[in-house]
Amino acid sequence: MLAVVGALSGCGTTTTAQPSPTGPGVLTLDKATAPEPGGEVGEASTEFQNATDMSMWTKLSETEKDVDRIGKFDINKTVKGSLYLEPRTSTWFDGFRGPYVYQELAGDVLMYARVKVEGMKGGQPKRKFSLGGLMARQPGSYAKPNWVSVTTGTADQSGQVEVKYTQDGSSKPQELAVKTGWVDLALGRVGRVFVALYREDGGKWKVGRRWPSNLPDVLQWGITAYTDWDSYNLLKKDATKANAKQVKGVPDLKMTVDFVRFLRPELPEYADALNTASVSDEVLIKAMTPAGA
């Protein structure tokens, strides 16, 4: 089991120290570079053109002997050229565990995907907290979960992106309004910061959240989808009991993933990505989204 190094503080906030706008602590747009494709992380990328790509992804339920909460999962079958996933009634919140397929990668990583989340009969999911997207998780953190995610679908309302950091089993989510349809999601770690970004179809990239990162070097990077928080009823207060069985409910989510691409982001040592005066949203977007994307 890998342990968290240090402790998270000020989760979801930026630092208050303000460097001079022209001082050495400011990363300007012309000095920022887009993430690099290729290498070890590049080999983890896939466009989902072949069913054999399934072998690249590992189910969390298999590695950590959990309940398999995935109803349907295939590549280049239900939707040609795409990964397709239907979760059973499930959730990722605090100590609750849901579906997750992943690859283990080390170091600074940017994971970029194009996803579409719908209800089972089309349109937006009707059950609360029916969301799908990207997650990075500390392996083996069953008793005290540590993970970060960016997902889209229906949270407390339909048409939302949710950005969420969970430290030692305590989740801090934030919802942001988004248009329905295809959404580009990006989740990355660079240095001491995690970043979640999103882009509506035909729109511009936006920074969803920045968080301090003190998680281990090796993380699980992958895809999650969950649905139907309504059906947890009394189990909403008991993650241990909920995790021990498949909760019966009315799942209402199907997710299509067009591609998942992995890149290596990089920031100069003087840049403090937790400080918007050091690294503005505009600069962070350039540093944490693929060139030309």
Locate each region found by the language model.
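Sec-dependent N-terminal signal peptides
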Residues: M1-V4
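C-terminal motif of bacterial Sec signal peptides marking the signal peptidase cleavage site
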Residues: A7-G10
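Extracellular glycan-recognition regions
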Residues: T15, S20-A293
